[in-house]
A protein has these predicted regions:
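N-terminal periplasmic/intermembrane-space "pro-region" immediately following the signal or transit peptide
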Residues: 2, 41-89, 93, 117-121
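Short loop/turn motifs that connect adjacent beta-strands in outer-membrane beta-barrel proteins
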Residues: 66-82, 115-127, 172-175, 240, ...
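Outer membrane beta-barrel
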Residues: 101-217, 221-252, 353-361, 366-394
Length: 458
C-alpha cells in the first residue's frame, strides 16, 4: 500500500467570483474556478489518504540483485517500483498417472508500480501494470491427468499476457481501499480474496494462492496471471475487522491464452465476490497468538447448462471459509518463527452446474523450524475435492456407449515440502506430492510427484 504525506490543514478557501459593476455573473466557473476545484480535489485526497512514515524498503534483504547499485532506491524515491519474479518447477512422476515423465514449467513476471504521491502529489494512489509469460510443459496435463496442478507456475497455459492494469486509491488513513481496472481475485503480491499467507508455503495449486475450487466451479473467476475488467472495495473500520467486495467481467473467453491478456471486451456475465474477515492478536501491542478468519461468497451471473439435462440453470454460486492460526512461537520473536495451522472450505451446493461442489484443504506450516535456518519453511498439507454426483451420473450413462468416458468421484493431494532460502531473493523448495484418484477417476493409478520449486525475486 502506498504511504501518504503527513496530515496537513488545507489553506484553500471557497472560490470567489469578482463582478465588474454593471456586468452579469459569469455563466460558468471559468478557468480560475476550475483550477480551484482541482486544488480542492487534490486536498481532499491528501486529507483522506493513508498517512505513514515513508520508510525505504530493505532491497538487499528481499531481492537477489539487491538495490541495483543504488538505482532501485533512487527509483523508489521517485515513486517507481519495478518487480521481477521468476518461478521454475522441474517436477516428475516416477510412479502413477497416465504415464511417467519429467517436465519443467515456468513463469516470468514483470510488474511496475507507480506511487502517485511522489509522481503526481496525490497521496494514497498507485498505478499497477504487469506482464507475465508461462512456458514449458505442464506435468499434470501431460503425464498425470490430475485436476490439482502439481507445479506452482501451472496457473495458466503457455504464452505471454498482460496481467494487471489497475489503479488503487487508499482513503481515510487506509481504512478504505478502492481498486479498478484489469484485475484478478487473487494477487501475486499481497492478498485479495480468500487468501492466507500459509497457502503460499505450498507448491500445489490446490492450495496456492487461494482455494482451487473457487476457480474450478466458477470459470468467470479470474486468477493471476489472467485478469479482467473489475472493481474492488475494501473497508476496515478497525484493525480487527474488514469487509470487501468486488464485481468483475466474468466472460471466461477473455482469459484464453490466445487473447494475450489484451481482450478488453466487456461481454459479461458479471462475477461477484464478497468477504468479511477478522484478525486476532495482530496489533503491535498484542501478546497473544495471531490468527485470521475469513468468510465469503461468490456468484457468476447468466445461465449455465445443467449436467443432467438439456435445460439451463441459474448462475453458479458458492461459499468459502478460510482460516489460519499460530499454534506456537519459538526462537527470537523478532524473527517471526512459529508453527501455524490453516484450513479452507469451499461449498458450491448446486450439483447440477458445479463440477466440484465440495472442497477442503488443511495443513501445518513451520516458519523457521531450525535455529540456524530462521527463514526456511517446512509445510505439509492435504487438499480434497469431491465431484458432482449429477455429473457422475451423466458420465456413467455416457460410458455405456462411449467407454473412454470416466465417471469422477474425488481427487486428493497430499504435499510435503521444505523451502530453503539460499540467498536473499532466491529460494529452493524440494517437495513430494501424493496424488490420489488423479482427475477424480479411480481407474487412473495414484501418482507420486517429486521435484523442486525455484523462485527468484530480482
Amino acid at each position: 500500500m502506498v504511504a501518504g504525506l503527513p496530515a496537513r490543514r488545507s489553506r484553500l478557501r471557497p472560490s470567489r467570483v469578482r463582478l465588474v459593476p454593471g456586468s452579469a455573473p459569469a455563466p460558468g466557473l471559468g478557468q480560475r474556478g476550475r483550477f480551484r476545484l482541482v486544488q480542492l480535489a487534490v486536498a481532499f485526497f491528501a486529507l483522506c489518504s493513508l498517512h505513514a512514515d515513508d520508510e525505504v524498503p530493505d532491497f538487499q534483504e528481499n531481492y537477489l540483485l539487491g538495490d541495483w547499485a543504488g538505482y532501485r532506491t533512487t527509483l523508489w524515491e521517485r515513486g517507481i517500483n519495478p518487480e521481477f519474479l521468476f518461478i521454475a518447477d522441474p517436477y516428475g512422476n516416477p510412479y502413477g498417472g497416465f504415464s511417467q515423465g519429467f517436465t519443467v514449467y515456468s513463469m516470468f513476471c514483470a510488474d511496475l508500480k507507480l506511487d502517485t504521491e511522489k509522481l503526481l502529489s496525490l497521496p494514497g494512489g498507485e498505478f499497477h501494470i504487469g506482464f507475465a509469460v508461462n512456458f514449458g510443459t505442464q506435468l499434470s496435463q501431460r503425464f498425470i491427468g490430475n485436476v490439482f496442478p502439481v507445479q506452482s507456475s501451472d496457473v495458466a497455459p503457455p504464452g505471454p499476457r498482460l496481467t494487471d492494469l489497475s489503479y488503487t486509491q487508499a482513503l481515510f488513513d487506509g481504512k478504505l481501499s478502492l481498486r479498478a481496472g484489469r484485475l484478478s481475485i487473487d494477487s501475486l503480491y499481497g492478498e485479495e480474496f480468500a487468501a492466507s499467507e500459509y497457502f503460499r508455503a505450498m507448491t500445489s495449486v490446490a492450495f496456492n494462492a487461494i482455494p482451487f475450487a473457487i476457480f474450478y466451479n466458477s470459470p468467470g473467476a479470474f486468477g493471476y496471471p489472467a485478469t479482467t475488467w473489475g472493481a474492488r472495495a475494501k473497508f476496515a473500520p478497525v484493525e480487527e475487522f474488514y469487509g470487501m467486495a468486488g464485481i468483475y467481467n466474468g466472460d471466461p473467453d477473455v482469459g484464453l491464452a490466445n487473447r494475450y491478456g489484451v481482450d478488453f471486451t466487456f461481454n459479461g456475465p458479471p462475477f461477484g465476490i464478497a468477504e468479511i474477515g477478522w484478525k486476532r492478536n495482530q496489533r503491535k501491542t498484542d501478546t497473544g497468538l495471531p490468527g485470521n478468519l475469513k468468510i465469503g461468497g461468490f456468484v457468476l451471473g447468466g445461465t449455465t447448462q445443467k449436467f443432467n439435462s438439456d435445460s439451463t440453470g441459474g448462475g453458479r454460486y458458492g461459499l468459502y471459509l478460510v482460516g489460519d492460526q499460530v499454534l506456537a512461537r519459538f526462537g527470537n520473536r523478532a524473527e517471526n518463527r512459529h508453527l501455524g495451522v490453516f484450513g479452507s472450505l469451499v461449498v458450491a451446493p448446486d450439483e447440477a452446474v458445479s463440477p466440484m461442489p465440495y472442497y477442503f484443504g488443511t495443513g501445518l506450516v513451520a516458519y523457521g523450524p531450525l535455529d540456524r535456518r530462521p527463514k526456511d519453511i517446512l509445510a505439509i498439507g492435504l487438499a480434497y475435492g469431491a465431484y458432482s454426483s449429477r455429473l457422475r451420473d451423466v458420465r456413467q450413462t455416457q460410458q455405456r456407449t462411449d467407454p473412454p468416458i470416466k465417471p469422477q468421484s474425488y481427487e486428493m493431494t497430499v504435499e510435503l515440502s521444505y523451502s530453503i532460502l539460499v540467498v536473499p531473493g532466491f529460494t529452493l523448495q524440494p517437495g513430494a506430492q501424493i496424488l490420489i484418484n488423479p482427475g477424480g477417476v479411480p481407474s487412473t493409478p495414484g501418482a507420486l510427484a517429486l521435484g523442486v520449486n525455484a523462485v527468484v525475486s530480482f
